[in-house]
């Protein structure tokens, strides 16, 4: 007896729409339902400082050179210097004094690139004050430096020896002519 098999292609569609299924992406939706308003990018309609212009001042570039941190403020007195030094000691930084006899302000001599590194080098006053725990020790060294170089610029630096970076630097003394 002969047996015969007949195969016919059968196409079936399985629709498993369960509760956790996400609907398929059908394209971008119309923006007709969303509010569309063209925004005005002109900020002059929002802000007005016309009344404040009278009390604004311009930094005078003549006779007012830019130095380091805090250079735009009036000179620091001994109590304010002591607070700055106490701050850098609290942070665990090592105080160091540097002085410059000719150019205390930014100028270009050895380097033509922009930025903080402007090619000027200051002379270190003695050695960094490793192990210093009292601000009066730093102020005593500052007085010695002022006595030795009354016409020089003197700055105090806070150096982080772990990260090996200078963390703070400010002018502690300027010559009387400045």
UniProtKB/Swiss-Prot annotation:
Family: Belongs to the RuBisCO small chain family.
Record's subcellular location: Plastid, Chloroplast
Pfam families, A to Z: RbcS, RuBisCO_small
InterPro entries (alphabetical): RuBisCO_ssu, RuBisCO_ssu_dom, RuBisCO_ssu_N, RuBisCO_ssu_sf
The organism of origin for this protein: Glycine max (Soybean)
GO CC, alphabetical: chloroplast
UniProt cross-references to HAMAP family, sorted A to Z: RuBisCO_S_bact
Principal subcellular localisation of the protein: plastid
GO MF, one example: ribulose-bisphosphate carboxylase activity
Coiled-coil spans in chain: none
One example of a Gene Ontology biological process annotation: photorespiration
Extra information: The basic functional RuBisCO is composed of a large chain homodimer in a 'head-to-tail' conformation. In form I RuBisCO this homodimer is arranged in a barrel-like tetramer with the small subunits forming a tetrameric 'cap' on each end of the 'barrel'.
Name of the protein described by the UniProt record: Ribulose bisphosphate carboxylase small subunit, chloroplastic 2
Task of the protein: RuBisCO catalyzes two reactions: the carboxylation of D-ribulose 1,5-bisphosphate, the primary event in carbon dioxide fixation, as well as the oxidative fragmentation of the pentose substrate. Both reactions occur simultaneously and in competition at the same active site. Although the small subunit is not catalytic it is essential for maximal activity.
Transit peptide: 1-54
Assembly and oligomerization: Heterohexadecamer of 8 large and 8 small subunits.
Entry keywords, A to Z: Calvin cycle, Carbon dioxide fixation, Chloroplast, Photorespiration, Photosynthesis, Plastid, Transit peptide
């Amino acid at each position: 007896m002969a047996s015969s098999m007949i195969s016919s292609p059968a196409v079936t569609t399985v629709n498993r729409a369960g509760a956790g299924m996400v609907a398929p992406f059908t394209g971008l939706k119309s923006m007709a339902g969303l509010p569309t308003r063209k925004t005005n990018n002109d900020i002059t309609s929002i802000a007005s400082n016309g009344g404040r212009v009278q009390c604004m001042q311009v930094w005078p570039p003549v006779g007012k050179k830019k130095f380091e941190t805090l250079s735009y403020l009036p000179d620091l007195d001994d109590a304010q210097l002591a607070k700055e030094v106490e701050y850098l000691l609290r942070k665990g930084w090592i105080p160091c004094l540097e002085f410059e006899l000719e150019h205390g302000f930014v100028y270009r001599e050895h380097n033509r690139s922009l930025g903080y590194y402007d090619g000027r080098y200051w002379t270190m006053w003695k050695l960094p004050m490793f192990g210093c725990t009292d601000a009066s020790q730093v102020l005593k060294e500052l007085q010695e430096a002022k006595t030795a170089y009354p016409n020089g610029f003197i700055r105090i630096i806070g150096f982080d020896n772990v990260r090996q970076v200078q963390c703070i630097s400010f002018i502690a003394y300027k010559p009387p002519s400045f």
